[in-house]
């Protein structure tokens, strides 16, 4: 139903001005910066790892601090307790407007609207990463095709409501409608990709 893309952020006073500068420093010493995350198995962390990997960084040596929520990691960044955080744009928009943070790159397929319109995508920086925390609805096992169709129609109607469209705007989400079959294909593909990366990081065991 929606895609939530993630941005790499540092404090406004950070000496790191660009994503390229961040990658250059981390290639020399991967443990230089402390990154905040809410889960080392979540897509916000894994998308960051993918960017670092493609940027030539020894990503297994990154310094990571785990928090219980995106807002907590954001506060830690603002307070100077961590150096960077890769998080949803909705967590950072007001801080960017206030001049408190700098967003270096976003993992979206194209540039996002204000206040992020001047922020390059990872792809623009020749780092081929597009990843989102997508929003959808899961049904119970055993739903009949007719029941699945009922919910597909109902949820499409929800997506046409002013309330849903306002949620998209407020959270910097991007609307994306796929049916149950396509959603399952995406789920399976992302599961395999995540499993491979988590195994590479030593977080899970290979099956």
Regions found by a protein language model. Give the residues of each.
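Hinge/capping helix and adjacent helix->loop/strand transition within the periplasmic-binding protein
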Residues: 1-72, 122, 134-167
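Small-residue (glycine/proline)-centered packing/hinge motifs flanked by hydrophobic/aromatic residues
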Residues: 111-129
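Conserved functional loop/turn residues at catalytic and ligand-binding sites
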Residues: 18, 80-81, 100, 126, ...
